[in-house]
Amino acid sequence: MKKAICALLSLFLLFGTLTLPALAAQDGEGTGTLPVSGEPEPPTDEPPTEDAAPDFAVLPFDDETTLIRPWRSELSGEWVLFLPAGADLTALTVETGADALLLGGTELHGGDKTDLLQPDAVLPLQIGERELTLRVLASENLPSVFISTESGSLDYIHADKSHKEKGRITTVENGEVTLSDAELKQIKGRGNSTWNYEKKPYNIKFDKKTGLLGMEKAKKWSLLASYVDQSLLRNPLATYLSNAMGLYFTPDYRWADLYVNGEYQGNYLIYESVEVGETRVDIHDLAADNEEANPDVDDLEDLPQVGTGPDGAVEDGYVFGSRKWIDIPNDPATIDGGYLLELEYRNRYPDELSGFVSKRGQCVVLKAPECASEWEVAYISSFYNEAEEALYAPDGRNSLGRHYSEYFDLPSLARMYILEEYAAEYDCGISSNYFYKDADSGLLVASPIWDFDIAFGRTDVVYDDMWLRDPAIWFANMRFERSGANGVTVVQPTVFNLVYRSAEFRQLVRETWQSYRELFAPANLTAEIDAMAGRIEASAVMDAIRWDLHRTTASDTTRAKVREQIGAVRSYVTGRTPALNRGFSENAALLYYEPNGAVGFMSHNAISAIGDAVTLYGDSRGKTIRLKAPEAGLSLLGWCEDPNGDGPVYAPGDRLTLQRQVTTLYAIWGVAPAVVEHTALLGDVDRDGQISAADARLALRAAVGLEVFAEKTDAPRFLLADLDGDKTITASDARLILRAAVGLDDLEGKTVTFTEPETPDEPENPENPENPSDPENPSDPENPSDPENPNDPENPSDPENPSDPENPSDPENPENPENPENPENPENPSDPEKPENPENPVEPTADQEG
């Protein structure tokens, strides 16, 4: 065994990338020509370059397929050996093609066992004349997965995501080999934006159903790289919440350290793929029905792809209402399910085999059956379009009279919305959102979850400083996609954006959120995060060093950085839960995005929400909402760009065209006036009780822009002038009013009922203290017409008011000059007993006597 491994290792090092399984395949056990470019260079006598792999490897387990070799850090120049968890660190087998090597000053030969390779050790390594530095890191707690490609390299697979290659796989759990050198039918790239990163995600497929790391047997598995999520926790946290909330068919997963062709690739999430199957999305398998109905077709994927374009072509681009399918000769007996649908970005949609673009512009991919027939795509697209029409309708009903609740399973939709909103998952409602429709079911069920690495306060590297880090934002209920068709750009609101406008759905969300308050409690989630973090920390440190995430190979420094990433997730959930407790309260504010323009819609007279202002982003980044809770009894009167309310105030429901990339609006609070209901004749624009030419003139002025009848702020005139009910005042409306005024048309006494704020001159308002015309208002101190108001000191008409010093009609007023009994009145000429009165003509003065 020792000599065989040493000989193979020498060849491995000469050719640079060939692994043991690859060499075995070329020795008669292979499967054909390897998909590699060119031939390996012949060996030379030149000394190895600085970055050439050293003649050194380690066998951590008693299985030759687990042989691993060190990786060179370009940053430090060190060679780093990443050891899997469960290896016996006191007796690791060293392999080398050299006669001997010096490790930490100890001479070792191929096949020797050593205890020198301890975690965090930094050792000198000398092989012949090469003097190297070897840093040792070791994982803990996690299983390890060893994959070898048929070519012995990842170059062909990395050249294009569609490239496939055969391989073999070994798994180790708790130090025990649980799957040894099993055949892989294929390994290939996967993902969308994640495929563009240095650390690649992969899909693997077995020939037969195989269990991995204790999970249920299946053929397909996904290896997620989590490159943008340096905490490595976000997908697992979403999975934990999904399972706890009872979302259907939540994919299972395991963390694992992945080695490919002997080189450490990092910490990966081995996830169950999203597909129809007994152990996955367990609904009726319509794809199997298609195969059974077409026994003469070896592979349905080889049949032509057809579309609704001219002559059956698949439309080149993004066309509303278009469909595409596979030209399958025979349909099954029934085609009502099961369907697994994925909402997708428009730029990714062309790569899919079967799908449709809804009449409103939503791209929908058929994940099952992937090879769908024309009638299958027609059936499910018609069903989805009806559901979408109901979502767009103000009353939630489509033109068939069917409510959106007749198309969607609302409990699952509410749970999925809450999870997407809580996580502020970047693709929510646009991509990686799945719905399934089973056979004999009339509902789309929101499940399963997928792809939460850009969530929980984490953004894509490109948008690293975006507002998504803020835990006090609305996101899922405002998400949209900007789309283009035939030179026209539209804004496509998501299913969550649309359904959250429904008061019934919001109430269901509030009730559902309340039922999971303990699950989302910060104490519960931070405890779960800490448990996850403790399990993967050693592996996370290795992963960060392997991919130079923190520009260091020092484990202590890297560990501190990893903990910072964990802390960011903890901080997010700590702030997110109380924010949504407010956001999902009975009187929370709502801001949603209206399609076909950069228009923010504020609705609901709200009195509490998530912060202190609302920020609207004029580009595709989305919208946020923050409202400061006012004092008790106040209502939201509108929004203003000035925090003090100076300037235009936009009423809830008004359209606001964003003039800049970012606009901040402040909530204006106050006591809302009482509202009264009025009824007027349709066409009586000036509300004088009759339809006349003056009404037609007002409507015409509005039609040509000389008058402005705002639908929200001038509702009465708008409603009375809009005779054809198209929510626009046109010359046609003015003409209809004029015809009615001159008797050519009869409006049959049609009326319009509307509400208006109660005004201070309303004569029937007994509570109005400023109403001078209300004779029955006893509490109005300024009402001069109330003769019975004893509290009015300025009321000259009250003869019984003894407290009025200027009342000339009060005979008991001591200052009344007409009061003959007033001895204190110095100007009273009629007082005969007042000798001090110089003007008293009756009583002579003292000077006049004598």
Language model features with spans:
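Internal "kinase-insert"/substrate-recognition segments embedded within catalytic cores
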Residues: 208-211, 225, 246-251, 263-418
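Low-complexity, acidic Ser/Thr/Pro-rich repeat tracts that form intrinsically disordered stalk/linker regions
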Residues: 20-66, 673-676, 757-764, 797-798, ...
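Middle-to-C-terminal accessory/interaction subdomains
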Residues: 349, 362-430, 435-590
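Conserved oxyanion/phosphate-binding beta-strand-loop segments in alpha/beta enzyme cores
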Residues: 165-225, 372-379
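Serine/threonine-rich, repeat-prone extracellular segments and beta-strand-based repeat modules
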Residues: 99-125, 642-666
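Secondary-structure capping and domain/repeat boundary segments
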Residues: 65-79, 586-681
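Predominantly extracytoplasmic/ectodomain segments of secreted and cell-surface proteins
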Residues: 32, 38, 48-118, 130-136
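Cellulosome-associated attachment modules in secreted, modular CAZymes
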Residues: 4-5, 16-25, 671-776, 780-782, ...
